[in-house]
């Protein structure tokens, strides 16, 4: 957030200085509006300092690569670095133009010495610009190599998913081992390139300009500033002089930029030898520091913005003390050469990245039509190797064929990637996979099938010139019994469809609801042309055959467009009948409210990110935080490593096909001809940094130049079949393959985030934090169970006892839960469904003892299971869900084994609450005086009602409750329960409940809550601040002392409070 802006002109050739400022990480969810200007102590006395000390001399330069690559962060830093280098070039080009113009004007009437100096300056700038250009080329080269390794890693990852969904076999296991090895190699290459790129980031020169504050800086105050950036440190001390100036023992330092890492700044006020008061601590983003001109920034040290640290930061593209090439330059070149060899059969050419990518474009003869060569490459490498080895063990060594071979294939009469508008011939394609389950087969118009002796996975491509009689000869070997059974199956109650409608690319597929279709049997006298599928002929669907154990060949028509789209369409449509039969056993959610389904749209990623962000600053504070972080990371790893088993076998099969084909989409660089003049190489994307970009702008520009281009395979899959990812190479969404389990994980991640926020807020009140940590410990156990379920029985658990084995000991609770959840969603149940089941099972019993209280009792129970501060409203029930782990954990923690008896106890609570709410004035006063503390249940609903009665405007009601709470507080058991509940209420987000809890704590004289009240005094809501301050002042000498210290150093009191677990990065 921009909190201050000013101009700074140190002089020199840089001219006007651009200035920005930042606020760092904010502890509050919403910052208060602040003034844009502040009082600055412009003149700061500097103590004499020795030669500038470089941080990397202390061991910063560590060539050990990181364990995990950070591709998103690398992309951000690369963009910022490129912008900074381009800006440097622009600045120096402007300076060069100015000096050149001066030189021309001075040549006639100037002395030789002046001309010599000016010419010397021009040559210096030119040399520097050439060095900048070379530096940019090195950065581009590394980033291009990084992009390739990233794409290869994504491809290997998706191949792992494809193999995980296929039947297990020895060849598959060997292939999976090889792919894992390749995945590890690509990951190590990415980490190595990150280290090499980090060495090209230059250095940041940071100058201390002093502190500024609104009446916070007094003469004699001493401050210590500690800056941390990765392994680099800078500590300096300063003092505020009598004349308002400042003296610091350090003036300037140098930090080497890091790809991963932020600058952490901590300011401490030194009161004495052992007294140090933390003024503030912030963490700052560094991307915007890559600028050609020095920047003066103002850092907000505290949340109120009353203390600011002024720094002047200058970025230099080169390490001024290390003008020579890095010691690892030879290793880097060797590594790049090794990586380049994977994409070229011969000696790799030196890439320039400004004009073309790693891959050479093919140049067919002008009289031949432009064709894509990826199919030819696949035919010569992928298919051939697959046929020979029957496995994918050598996939990492796949690479495009030599140019001569590719041109041979590209000159075929028809290319299967064309739309077929001008094609007059059709190319029959026969594909067979024997390792697909269920013995699925496809019957063509002649019931073509693979020979009985063909048992290995095989993909064959038959060109148009191929003699069709060879195909007919294959049909003679097919078993007559199999043909007869196929014909009989077609005749039993199944009607053929005359035409399969084209699906809308934007409409999601619903394989479970589509009707079953049969293969249409053509007459045996049909000609050879019937081997091809026409638009008016029903598409052949995959059908289960008891006798067949392999997939019969599928004839595909090249005139219908992309082979991949046809293949996916056939495979997915063939699985429609099985999807209906498997729906119940797969465990996919059906028939639940829309509120439940809304959690499936990208919520798993959001829930993981929210919890990890809340844990990150505080995970070392408690052992429970560390355990939770470990379990959450373990669950996240399981979901990332597991294949995305979708809602049915149909989409799972589509994912397998798509993953295998799109993994290496980036290798599909079309071999289009040169431009019209034939002299230039086709440059797609228009820049060094756009070779592997998938942005919409580049996609449209690519297609506008080449309208016949089909784009990425994954994009075509999405448009024509409705399955697959929307952007090529994008990561698949996290999912367990079971919607009910997904919703359950999201709910518990969100609840853990809420608990972490409350624990951080109450960290200075041990008994409150201890109670909340107990709840968090139970959630850690839940996370462990969720990870086990997701890892071992992904999406296939149909019994609650399998998820929670201890459930069989509580049969009444288990019986009720099975009535609440649907057969296909055992992990959760909508809250309104739980309410309806409670009414159906227990409404008569509750109303018999407490007439008319059944509905509030049930809503109270559901609210307590969800750990809500107040009963749920009827309107919000439809959007809430109860998970089986919440249900079981609640009753276990309360020692409940019989639901009916527990509802009777809860009804007593609700009855007393309604009694207190309905009484007024004298009746309430009389009732409260008659109640003894031992007779009043110290339960959540009763305590909440008593506190809310204190907020009424009626003084007599408030007085009655005050007298009762004061008397009840003498009972130790009641006071402990009330104190814990009201302190926990302070951590809730309900403002009315926070206000009521403050008033109740005031009556209880709860000095134990002072630290939490001090935190609440910094609330954004004025009403809450006033009530908390009044309560604080009423708590005797300790409360008054805490309130007085609040004005002196608020950050020391609220450095944890007010931070609800989320921090926002703020750029310079």
Swiss-Prot record:
Lineage of the species this protein comes from: Eukaryota, Metazoa, Chordata, Craniata, Vertebrata
The UniProt record lists the keyword Cell wall biogenesis/degradation: no
Gene source species: Homo sapiens (Human)
Regions of compositional bias (Basic and acidic residues) in chain numbering: 494-510
Positions of region (Disordered): 45-73, 474-524
Composition-biased stretches (Polar residues): 474-491
Induction remark: Up-regulated during fetal mononuclear myoblast differentiation. Up-regulated during cytotrophoblast differentiation. Up-regulated during granulocyte differentiation. Isoform 1 and isoform 2 are down-regulated in T lymphocytes upon T-cell antigen receptor (TCR) stimulation. Isoform 1 and isoform 2 are up-regulated by FOXO1.
GO molecular function per UniProt: 14-3-3 protein binding
Recorded GO CC terms: apical plasma membrane; cytoplasm; cytoskeleton; cytosol; filopodium; stereocilium; stereocilium membrane
Biased composition (Basic residues): 48-59
Name of the protein described by the UniProt record: Rho family-interacting cell polarization regulator 2
Coiled coil regions in record: 83-112, 768-793
InterPro entries in the cross-refs: ARM-like (IPR011989), ARM-type_fold (IPR016024), FAM65_N (IPR031780), RIPOR3 (IPR026136)
Location of Phosphoserine modifications: 21, 37, 341, 523, 573, 585
Reported effect, residue 585 to A: Reduces phosphorylation, interaction with HDAC6, YWHAB and 14-3-3 proteins, localization at the front of the neutrophil upon chemokine stimulation and prevents T cell proliferation inhibition
Disease cited in the entry: Deafness, autosomal recessive, 104: A form of non-syndromic sensorineural hearing loss. Sensorineural deafness results from damage to the neural receptors of the inner ear, the nerve pathways to the brain, or the area of the brain that receives sound information. Deafness, autosomal dominant, 21: A form of non-syndromic sensorineural hearing loss. Sensorineural deafness results from damage to the neural receptors of the inner ear, the nerve pathways to the brain, or the area of the brain that receives sound information. DFNA21 is an autosomal dominant, progressive form with incomplete penetrance. Age at onset ranges from infancy to late adulthood.
Keyword Acetylation: no
């Amino acid at each position: 957030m921009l909190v201050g802006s000013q101009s700074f002109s140190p002089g020199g050739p840089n001219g006007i200085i651009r200035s920005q400022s930042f606020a760092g990480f904010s502890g509050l969810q919403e910052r208060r509006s602040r003034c844009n200007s502040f009082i600055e102590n412009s003149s700061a006395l500097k103590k004499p300092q020795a030669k500038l000390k470089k941080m990397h001399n202390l061991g910063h330069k560590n060539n050990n690569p990181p364990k995990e690559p950070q591709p998103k962060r690398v992309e951000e830093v690369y963009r910022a670095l490129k912008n900074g280098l381009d800006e440097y070039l622009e600045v120096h080009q402007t300076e060069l133009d100015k000096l050149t113009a001066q030189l021309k004007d001075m040549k006639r009437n100037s002395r030789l010495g002046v001309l010599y100096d000016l010419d010397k300056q021009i040559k210096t700038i030119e040399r520097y610009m050439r060095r900048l250009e070379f530096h940019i080329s090195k950065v581009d080269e590394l980033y291009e190599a990084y992009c390739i390794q990233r794409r290869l890693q994504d491809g290997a990852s998706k191949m792992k998913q494809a193999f995980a969904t296929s039947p297990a076999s020895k060849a598959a296991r060997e292939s999976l081992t090889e792919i894992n090895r390749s995945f590890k190699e690509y990951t190590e290459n990415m980490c190595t390139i990150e280290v090499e790129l980090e060495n090209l980031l230059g250095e940041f020169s940071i100058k201390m300009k002093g502190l500024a504050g609104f009446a916070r800086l007094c003469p004699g105050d001493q401050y210590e500033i500690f800056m941390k950036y990765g392994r680099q440190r800078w500590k300096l001390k300063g003092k505020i002089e009598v004349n308002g100036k400042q003296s610091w023992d350090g003036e300037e330092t140098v930090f080497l930029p890091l790809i991963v890492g932020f600058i952490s700044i901590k300011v401490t006020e030194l009161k004495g030898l052992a007294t140090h008061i933390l003024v503030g601590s912030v963490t700052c983003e560094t991307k915007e520091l890559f600028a050609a001109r020095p920047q003066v920034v103002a850092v907000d040290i505290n949340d109120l913005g009353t203390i600011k640290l002024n720094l002047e930061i200058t970025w230099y593209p080169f390490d001024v003390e290390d003008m020579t090439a890095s010691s690892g330059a030879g290793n880097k070149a060797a590594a790049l050469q090794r990586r380049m060899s994977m994409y070229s059969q011969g000696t790799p050419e030196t890439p320039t990245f400004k004009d073309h990518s790693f891959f050479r474009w093919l140049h067919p003869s002008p009289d031949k039509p432009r064709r894509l060569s990826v199919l030819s490459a696949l035919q010569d490498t992928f298919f051939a190797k697959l046929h020979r080895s029957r496995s994918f063990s050598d996939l990492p060594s796949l690479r495009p064929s030599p140019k001569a071979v590719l041109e041979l294939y590209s000159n075929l009469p028809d290319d299967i990637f064309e739309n077929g508008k001008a094609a007059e011939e059709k190319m029959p394609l026969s594909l067979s996979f024997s390792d697909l389950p269920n013995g699925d087969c496809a019957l063509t118009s002649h019931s073509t099938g693979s020979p009985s002796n063909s048992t290995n996975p095989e993909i064959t491509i038959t060109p148009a010139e191929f003699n069709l009689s060879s195909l007919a000869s294959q049909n003679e070997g097919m078993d007559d019994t199999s043909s007869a059974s196929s014909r009989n199956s077609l005749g039993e109650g199944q009607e053929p469809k005359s035409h399969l409608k084209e699906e809308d690319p934007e409409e999601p597929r619903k394989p479970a609801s589509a009707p079953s279709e049969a293969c249409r049997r053509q007459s045996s006298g049909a000609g050879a042309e019937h081997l091809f599928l026409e638009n008016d002929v029903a598409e052949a669907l995959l059908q289960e055959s008891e006798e067949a154990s392999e997939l019969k060949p599928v004839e595909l028509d090249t005139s219908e467009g992309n082979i991949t789209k046809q293949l996916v369409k056939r495979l997915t449509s063939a699985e429609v009948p099985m999807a209906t039969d498997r729906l119940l056993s797969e465990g996919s959610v059906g028939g639940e409210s829309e509120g439940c389904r809304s959690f499936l749209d990208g919520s798993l990623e959001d829930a993981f990110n929210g919890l990890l962000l809340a844990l990150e600053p505080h995970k070392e504070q408690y052992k429970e935080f560390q355990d939770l972080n470990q379990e959450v990371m373990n669950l996240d790893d399981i979901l990332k490593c597991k294949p995305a088993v979708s809602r049915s076998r149909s989409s799972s099969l589509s994912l397998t096909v798509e993953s295998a084909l799109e993994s290496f989409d980036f290798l599909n660089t079309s071999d289009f001809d040169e431009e019209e003049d034939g002299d230039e190489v086709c440059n797609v994307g228009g820049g060094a940094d756009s070779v592997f970009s998938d942005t919409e702008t580049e996609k449209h520009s690519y297609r506008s130049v080449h309208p016949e281009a089909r784009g990425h395979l994954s994009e075509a899959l999405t448009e024509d079949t409705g399955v697959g990812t929307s952007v090529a190479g994008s990561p698949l969404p996290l999912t367990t393959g079971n919607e009910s389990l997904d919703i359950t994980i999201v709910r518990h991640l969100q609840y853990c985030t809420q608990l972490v926020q409350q624990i951080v807020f109450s960290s200075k009140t041990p008994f409150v934090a201890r109670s909340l940590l107990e709840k968090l410990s139970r959630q850690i156990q839940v996370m462990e169970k969720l990870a086990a379920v997701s890892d071992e029985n992904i999406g296939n658990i149909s019994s609650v006892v399998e998820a929670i084995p201890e459930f069989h000991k509580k049969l009444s609770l288990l019986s009720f839960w099975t009535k609440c959840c649907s057969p296909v969603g055992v992990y959760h149940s909508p809250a309104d469904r739980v309410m309806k089941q409670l009414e159906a099972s227990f409404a008569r019993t509750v109303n018999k003892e407490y007439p008319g209280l059944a509905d509030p009792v049930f809503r109270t129970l559901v609210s307590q299971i969800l750990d809500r501060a107040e009963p749920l409203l009827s309107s919000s029930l439809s959007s809430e869900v109860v998970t089986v782990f919440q249900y079981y954990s609640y009753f276990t923690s309360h020692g409940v084994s019989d639901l009916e008896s527990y509802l009777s106890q809860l009804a007593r609570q609700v009855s007393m609450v309604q009694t207190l709410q309905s009484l007024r004035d004298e009746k309430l006063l009389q009732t409260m005086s008659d109640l003894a503390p031992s007779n009043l249940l110290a339960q959540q609903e009763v305590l909440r009602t008593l506190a809310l009665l204190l907020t009424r405007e009626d003084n007599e009601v408030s007085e009655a409750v005050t007298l009762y709470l004061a008397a009840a507080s003498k009972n130790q058991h009641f006071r402990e329960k009330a104190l814990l509940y009201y302190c926990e209420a302070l951590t809730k987000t309900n403002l009315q409940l926070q206000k009521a809890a403050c008033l109740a704590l005031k009556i209880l004289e709860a000095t134990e809550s002072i630290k939490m009240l001090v935190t609440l005094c910094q609330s954004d809501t004025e009403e809450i601040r006033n009530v908390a301050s009044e309560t604080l002042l009423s708590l005797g000498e300790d409360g008054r002392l805490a309130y007085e210290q609040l004005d002196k150093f608020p950050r020391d009191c609220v450095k944890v409070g007010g931070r609800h677990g989320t921090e926002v990065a703020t750029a310079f």
